[in-house]
Amino acid sequence: MFNQLSDEQKMLKKLALLSGIKPCTASSMLFSFPYSQQKLIDASTQKLFDLFGKLRNTDRLKFLIEEAIDRGIDIDVQDKDGFTLLHKSINERDYNIAGFLLERKANPNIHDRDIVTPLNRIAGKPLSKTEEDFHMAKLLLQKGALTEPTDFSGWTPIQYAVFNEKIGIVELLIDYGANLDIIVPKGFYKGKNLIELVRAISSIFSDQSLNKQLQTLLKLATACQNNDFGLVDYSVKKENSDTEDDSVTKEDIEKFINHKISIKPSVKLLPKYLKELIRLKGFLETKEEFIKDNTIKRLEDNINSKSSLKYLLLSKIVESPSLYKFDVGMPEDLKESLEEHGLKLVGDID
């Protein structure tokens, strides 16, 4: 039985499935990955790469990297495996060094010879589900990591995050606008979208409640993205009911809304964010229980606030923020949002 396998065996079986190899066959032990073009580096730089995983003194490693940069080394140079210094730090889970490199403008979108980016790598590690992984993925996205790079299997980060039960990273990628209509291009799960993928691997999950949480998150997020609320098999949960099913409850929707309201989308993602909230509000207005409480009002308030923010961020204020001043009646949350986007209005123009 699959559930009786060790974590390492589960990981190997998952990798075999991703590569299109049927489990329990001789070929499942011999799958390999294609390589991309290699880039060679000089011997002194190779020594720096070799220190990863060996030198445990983080400050010393930072010093050596700084010294190499001062000598003129390209921070994005690649070794024979296509790894950059950022790749090496991610592979070794040395996230302190990874953050250090990103602050020095390391490119988060370079792929190695297996066409794997740092974000692909974090999402694709089957046995690594820590807070550190989540925060590293978040930092990569904040520093410009793309959400849609495909690796040797044609998988994107969100597909790997779903497959590996990393619900925090799935939610993070949704916040950053990841494509939720992505289809598995080949292999055992060929043709499946994200929701179908979660259902297909439900027997692999040791925690079935986590599988349901993933399904619920993807149903709601995809419904908002595509304005297709037929995906949301909503039901009012009856008190004292112990029945477990795949339906989306009022509590699920409220949790989803709370998260959506809490995030601070970039200027680029604001239009998409607003469109999705307006669609969700329209869906909830057909449900009496949401009309009775303040859920819809909370959505309306957030939509109005973010719409005002969008208007200001796309106006002439952005060109010369120092010339303008805050309107006396401007809500505090809007003032804070402007300042979070780097706009301090201290001038004389209303």
Curated annotation (Swiss-Prot):
Task: Extract the SMART domains matched here.
Answer: ANK
Q: Does the keyword Repeat apply?
A: yes
The UniProt keywords, alphabetically, are: ANK repeat, Repeat
Coiled-coil annotation reads none
- Tell whether Repeat is among the UniProt keywords: yes
Query: Taxonomically, what lineage is the organism?
Result: Bacteria, Pseudomonadati, Pseudomonadota, Alphaproteobacteria, Rickettsiales
PANTHER family named among the record's database cross-references: ANKYRIN REPEAT AND PROTEIN KINASE DOMAIN-CONTAINING PROTEIN, ANKYRIN REPEAT-CONTAINING PROTEIN-RELATED
ANK repeat ranges are 81-110, 114-151, 153-182
Judging by the UniProt lineage, the source's domain of life is Bacteria
Report what the protein is called: Putative ankyrin repeat protein RBE_0589
